[in-house]
């Protein structure tokens, strides 16, 4: 009989409702190395103390419910309950708090992102006592992360497979994203790869529609890959989107890609689901396929600052579930992403050990031990004038992906690819020579234009294109 059971038997069961903070707010608690730690941005309803709100989050995402129950006496709540162990006000905001919650490791199934999220964020976000709730960060202990395979291959293995080192990889999303026949789609893939790109990509919503069934697309893209490889002497790839309506169909598509001998497949991990993604990642490791991950639907979850879940949490979850690439914003393009915040979760994707750094939005020190890293993909509204900034921001271990910035070239797809490859090589050379990419960006690109008419034409087309909007989700700073 557990100590708690003995206590219950001694004093008798007392029915009723009691404040969550009496059981789940424990500021004296010292976190364990094996705890999963969570940082929640809590906005309580008027009249709800922050301690009660934080305790409610801990309770409703672990062992608690709205009233006392008889069966509490049949287990040890002290062993299994979540604990709100610290609360702090959010800088520059009124009635917002960061509530830190510790969860015992035994609450979670090994190797299951699905179970982890079902517990931590599955129910509590609809709790009436909270006006809004956002999961800002998680600390995944090595004791839990080691139960996951993680990325199928990781950064170093991918570079070895491709035999490409010392620079970012270049990609292109085929446009228009919907409506092309499989043959015309394959033609665009070939032209881009022949022009100097490393990868081309299915858009996230290209699955198997009436205008282009998946098997036809796979065959024409494989033909384009082999033809471009033969002409350039470089290893090429196309992200064949295996996302489907069922897990069984998804695996059939991945198997077809393997039989065609292509190097990489793709999955929409949020719309497809973490269970499907983990299954696909395991298949990819066992069969030598790289796995590109698109984050379609992420902004529904992560864009609002006071409610939902920050992308750094989704990025950590993806690294655990498995993926070799994931879209991570651009900072300079058309999609949301503040620089320091973006660099924070880029490091969480790539590095083995990341120190706590609130200036970049990192709430906890994260040790991935030996889990392979994930290449961040910069994609969305970028073109050749952005190349110096992208090279400086993301470094070598990244994929820079230009869709309209390749296919929108006035001379065609292959010249668009040439322009991007020349711009990238010029930026890498300038950086290696010690030049300041941020300060000399325009000069570096203009110098390269002298040797590449394709780049000069691209620069002329996109010289006035900028996306200068303030990001919605920004780091917390004190307001004057």
From Swiss-Prot:
Residues marked Transition state stabilizer (site): 334
Residues found modified as N6-carboxylysine: 201
Entry cofactors: Mg(2+)
Cellular localization per UniProt: Plastid, Chloroplast
Binding site for Mg(2+): 201, 203-204
Domain of life, source organism: Eukaryota
GO cellular component, one term: chloroplast
Other facts: The basic functional RuBisCO is composed of a large chain homodimer in a 'head-to-tail' conformation. In form I RuBisCO this homodimer is arranged in a barrel-like tetramer with the small subunits forming a tetrameric 'cap' on each end of the 'barrel'.
NCBIfam families xrefs: PRK04208.1
Name used for this protein in its record: Ribulose bisphosphate carboxylase large chain
